[in-house]
Amino acid sequence: MPLITLDSLSLSFSDKPILNEVSSTILKGDKIALIGRNGEGKSTFMRILAGTIEPDDGKLKIKNGVTISYLEQTPPENNDKNLFDIVAEGLGEIGGILTKYQHLIKQEKLDEAGKYQQKIDQLDGWQYLHKIEAILNRFTLNGDTTLATLSGGWRRRVMLARALIQEPDVLLLDEPTNHMDITAILDLERMLKEYHGTLILISHDRSFVAGIVNKVFDLDRGNLSVFECGYKDYVKRKDEQLHAEELANARFDKKLAQE
């Protein structure tokens, strides 16, 4: 059964069609590149999948229990939270309890910290503390650093860590390599290759995309074409498709001129 089903989704902005009765399925293990020209509505499509905006028509069907994590294109704004707290937010309630416990320990409020320690014991929460520490290390992040002190590229690393710690069934990434240096990009590529969930990715870095995806969604003037192949094969098939369209248009123009 598909994790996500798109059933005749339609959306327009100011009479411009973004999605025109789009139907498709997203399966477990799919690693999908969402391709299209600038302004085609790729980020809007991603937000529909994330549930942050609604289509005008059609249905987005998500299998019961499926979790989705979404990394937007814009880095987070300045705030004074430390990186441990931000990553822990991805764990929901237990993340908040661990954050409060850590702050109380640092403030040496041991009696109050003991109450939170009991909650953590009851929820078997220490494993999540280890998960937070492990993913901070994986992204070379210091949990005590505040977000406001970081550049755009490092902020994206923080938000990626928060998205991945949830171990979502579906991970939506909109231009994840923006502001990153080559070392960080290569490390992220390795990480996403190892990721066992379903991935939907927007990126202008074609080399990065080619190393990861096994399927392509091509968004063109509101229409979605699905290519069941990697990025390099998609490029070949797309070129062949465009060439065939050019020949067909030329034949039509020639016939029209003769009439």
Feature map (PLM): residue ranges:
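Short cytosolic helices in intracellular loops of multi-pass membrane proteins
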Residues: A250-E259
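ABC ATP-binding cassette signature C-motif
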Residues: M1-R251
